[in-house]
Amino acid sequence: MISSNDFRTGTTIELDGQVWRVIEFLHVKPGKGSAFVRTKLKNVMTGNVNERTFRAGETLPQAVVEKRDMQFVYPQGDNEYVFMDMESYEQEALTRETLGDGAKYLKEGMSVSILKWQERVIGVDLPNTVVLQVVETDPGVKGDTAQGGTKPAKVETGAEVMVPLFITIGEKIKIDTRDNSYLGREN
């Protein structure tokens, strides 16, 4: 059992016979009345997103999720990605729908954590940051940085990130996978 006060992003709960993952949460303490927790939940089976409010301190059954360390091996076709279990060396193919937005950051050899519930893959935890090479971006013109502007850049995995004007093709940049933001250059 887990209290609604202990909700964090990524927490999994069982509700109405299904598994839900907390995407967003907000503890609200109104001036009058009791505190409550406003959440945005994603159904791990169907992908549906639902907003729900719980009383502060309300207990719910927590879904026991197994975390397995796996390595991305290669993409298979347009919609599948093959991962290898680091302990048993078994390979498993996951679809783009299962990976969600994380698919655009996958680079061969990258280590990720696969989340399983009752032997079914329900999600993937990527590293918080990745270092990728810029393969396509507009050239920066000298004097463009007076206002600190940004421009779109495409990286080696196909993801598009907004970067400062001084970034050029071939540079390696650090990207935050949680919000798709540029963090800095890498050597």
Swiss-Prot record:
Keywords: Cytoplasm, Elongation factor, Protein biosynthesis
GO CC, alphabetical: cytoplasm
Biological process, per Gene Ontology: peptide biosynthetic process
Main subcellular location of this protein, as a coarse class: cytoplasm
Subcellular location field: Cytoplasm
Pfam families, per the entry: EFP (PF01132), EFP_N (PF08207), Elong-fact-P_C (PF09285)
InterPro entries to which the protein is assigned, alphabetical: Elong-fact-P_C, NA-bd_OB-fold, Rib_uL2_dom2, Transl_elong_fac_P/YeiP, Transl_elong_KOW-like, Transl_elong_P/YeiP_cen, Transl_elong_P/YeiP_CS, Transl_elongation_fac_P
SUPFAM superfamilies: Nucleic acid-binding proteins, Translation proteins SH3-like domain
UniProt key word Cytoplasm: yes
Pathways involved: Protein biosynthesis; polypeptide chain elongation
Keyword Cytoplasm: yes
MF terms in GO: translation elongation factor activity
SMART domains: EFP, Elong-fact-P_C
Function: Involved in peptide bond synthesis. Stimulates efficient translation and peptide-bond synthesis on native or reconstituted 70S ribosomes in vitro. Probably functions indirectly by altering the affinity of the ribosome for aminoacyl-tRNA, thus increasing their reactivity as acceptors for peptidyl transferase.
Similarity field: Belongs to the elongation factor P family.
Protein name in UniProt: Elongation factor P
Species, as recorded: Gloeobacter violaceus (strain ATCC 29082 / PCC 7421)
Gene: efp
